[in-house]
Amino acid sequence: VYAELLDFSVKSSSVGDMPDLPLKVMMNVGNPDRAFDFACLPNEGVGLARLEFIINRMIGVHPRALLEFDDQEPGLQNEIRELMKGYDSPREFYVGRLTEGIATLGAAFYPKRVIVRLSDFKSNEYANLVGGERYEPEEENPMLGFRGAGRYVSESFRDCFALECEAMKRVRNDMGLTNVEVMVPFVRTVAQAKAVVEELERQGLKRGENGLKIIMMCE
C-alpha cells in the first residue's frame, strides 16, 4: 500500500440524530456479496433472504443433477465438474456453497435476526439450472404449481431438500449463527405446514431447539 499515491474522497452521513421509529425496519437482502455493505446501514436485521439467489448465483446446478451425477451424460458431467472445482463431491459442492452464502448473511448482521427463506423456485426456473430440464415437469401455470412447501415433502424432492437442511444446520449448529431463522414458502394447507415442520425435524431442524424459529408464508 503506497500512501497518497491515488486521490480518493470519503462521503459520510451522520445518522445519530435520527428519531427512533415505532417499528423495526428489516432489509430484503439477496446477494451475500453485498451483505456487509448493507449491514452498515441502519437496520433491524434481514426480513427476507431468498435462497434462490444463492443457488442461482453461487451454484447454478439442479440439486437432483448433482445427487445423480454419475447418471448424467459425459458432456453434462464435464460442465458440472467445471462449476464444482475445489469441492470433493457434487453433494458437498451444493451444501458447501449454500452454507457459505447463508453464513455470510448471518455473520454480517449478527446478532440481529436474519430470516432465510428456503428454496421457492418454480418448475420452469429449476429447469433453467444446469441439468434441470430432465427433472422438471412442464406446467401450464408454474406460479401455482410444484413449488415451495409442496416440494419439500414430495418423494421426488425430499432428498434435495435435505441438502438445504444440512446447510442450515451447519450455519446454526456448527458456526453458531443462531440468529438465522427459517422461512417456509408457499404453504397451502395446515396439513402441508405440519408435514414440513415434521420433515424439518427429521432433518435435524427442530422448532425451538437451539432457539430455532420457523416462519411460514401462507399463500
Language model features: what each stretch is:
Residues 8-12:
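Small/polar beta-strand repeat architecture
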Residues 5:
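Beta-strand/loop-dominated core regions that host nucleotide or nucleotide-derived cofactor-binding catalytic loops
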Residues 1:
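Conformationally flexible catalytic loops at phosphate/diphosphate-handling active centers
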